[in-house]
Amino acid sequence: MTKLFIPYIMGNKDLIENATLLSENGADIIEIGVPFSDPVADGPVIMEAGQQAIKQGITIDYIFNQLEKHGDQIKCNYVLMTYYNIICHYGEQAFFEKCRDTGVYGLIIPDLPYELSQRLKQQFSHYGVKIISLVAMTTDDKRIKDIVSHAEGFIYTVTMNATTGQNGAFHPELKRKIESIKAIANVPVVAGFGIRTPQHVADIKEVADGIVIGSEIVKRFKSNTREEIIKYLQSIQQTLNN
């Protein structure tokens, strides 16, 4: 089975250009961050990118507008990574409608309690927008079974107990945990948080069905040339499916 490559970008003025480049260079699903003033799950790189986007005047309406106009340029699925506060403020039903209308494949909502995610799935499943489940290494086995039994799209395993993109030190129990999740899952199980290099990818792909890379991609879009970014993406893609 081909491993999934899921890069993350911040929703900013370059959203469509960056997403298009990723979709042309091996991305299977793109995670688009919605800037938020209090991003509790984000590491310093993504937090700074979010602050910059807010200064640029980027809002969820801007992101929806761009996806509505130019989403067909993105040649793969895309999901929104957003905090529940944004959905609540927008209005749950209006938000899910807009996601459907702008081609959003799914939502990653890091501060969403499991019980609330179940309500949203039941209430808004007819819009066809998947709510992606997150599993931390600290999640107990009973809760994992509950989460996995209702998972849709893919399962996002958080490979560190720290915030995103720090030192890349994977939890010693990580592989065992991912394997146990895969044994009971009906959707791909991907690993994210702290994955930056082809070496990290080679290590984690032994057990995971795919990887999410966030901070490193955001950093490279900020400071690298287009050619350097493409070269990096190719190195990840090569390692992932070698």
Swiss-Prot record:
Pathway: Amino-acid biosynthesis; L-tryptophan biosynthesis; L-tryptophan from chorismate: step 5/5
Swiss-Prot/TrEMBL catalytic activity: (1S,2R)-1-C-(indol-3-yl)glycerol 3-phosphate + L-serine = D-glyceraldehyde 3-phosphate + L-tryptophan + H2O
Biological processes per GO annotation: L-tryptophan biosynthetic process
Primary enzyme class: lyase
GO molecular function per UniProt: tryptophan synthase activity
UniProt-annotated catalytic positions: 31, 42
Pfam family for this entry, one: Trp_syntA
Gene Ontology cellular component terms for the protein in this record: cytosol
InterPro entries in alphabetical order: Aldolase_TIM (IPR013785), RibuloseP-bd_barrel (IPR011060), Trp_synthase_alpha_AS (IPR018204), Trp_synthase_suA (IPR002028)
Keyword presence, Lyase: yes
EC number(s) from the headed UniProt entry: 4.2.1.20
Keyword Translocase among UniProt keywords: no
Keywords of the record: Amino-acid biosynthesis, Aromatic amino acid biosynthesis, Lyase, Tryptophan biosynthesis
Gene3D superfamilies from the UniProt entry: Aldolase class I
Quaternary structure (record): Tetramer of two alpha and two beta chains.
Job of this protein: The alpha subunit is responsible for the aldol cleavage of indoleglycerol phosphate to indole and glyceraldehyde 3-phosphate.
Homology family: Belongs to the TrpA family.
UniProt name for this protein: Tryptophan synthase alpha chain
Organism field: Staphylococcus aureus (strain NCTC 8325 / PS 47)
Taxonomy of the source species: Bacteria, Bacillati, Bacillota, Bacilli, Bacillales
